[in-house]
Amino acid sequence: MSDFEKYLEKINAVHGLISALGLLNWDQETMMPSKAVLCRSRCNAVLSGLVHEIMTSPDFGELLERLSDQELSFDQTVAVRETKRDRDRAVKVPRKLVEELAMATTAANQTWVQARRENNWSLFAPDLQKIVELRKQQAEAIGYDEEPYDALLTEYEPGESTSNLVEQFSSLRDKLVPLLDKIRAKGSVDYDKLLQGNFEPALQQTMCINLLECIGFDFSGGRLDSSAHPFTAEIGCNTDVRLTVAYHRDNLGAALYAAIHEGGHGLYEQGLPSELMGT
């Protein structure tokens, strides 16, 4: 077995665990009984710990180092590079902290849904504070040059920094605020009036499905459900892409706009090359 085949064996195991986590998270958002949150938190913590164990194993680290010095195809080189970057971050964070974060975020999501439904911020505040404290610990473990948020930002935007974002946002604000003032000065037009009324959720769902089909979303490799807040989840491959929207009886636009937005994410996920799944 070649080193790259050994790599695929390891990374496929990681990918399988992450896919299971994705499915559990989707289930929590769409249909899990509210009383199951403690059990689900524990499951997510165990799976997250197993991912961390594989990623941080010395043998896997040595394998990635060997592969970094080998002649590989472009796709293989990128896969190894990105996996090595993820591992370099993972080895700095204790497994216990990874598991604590998984439990805290799972529990907090359920509390957030309740707090939003009851319009009661105080229900969610303690859970959010706990997550912030855990994220601070994570940032300190990973390390940073300027701001603690830099350590977390690079997980999604490699090479990006807080200071650079502040500069970009300041530039956007300088242009957008005057534009917004001009728009406000023109007065408002209620373009959404036709979308306001009393719309059955079942009717809204049918309209969203038709809309998604029109833009090319493949329902043989995806589905649409409802949740407190819209999201898109790719469960391990480009043939299992799950979208959600939130239905509001008095506002048809909320669901339609969400369907278009999430549908865009869904088209991206379904369009990813099948041969790269699991890498």
Residue ranges and their predicted role:
Residues 1-160:
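A well-structured
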Residues 1-6, 10, 74-80, 206-213, ...:
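Short secondary-structure boundary segments
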Residues 7, 143, 254-278:
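Active-site recognition of the HExxH zinc-binding catalytic motif
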Residues 18, 58, 119, 187, ...:
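Secondary-structure transition/capping residues
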Residues 23-29, 223-244, 265-279:
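Conserved catalytic-core motifs characterized by acidic clusters
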Residues 39, 168, 259:
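Short acidic-hydrophobic sequence patches enriched in Asp/Glu that either
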Residues 104-254:
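Contiguous, non-catalytic segments that form substrate-binding/exosite surfaces or channel walls
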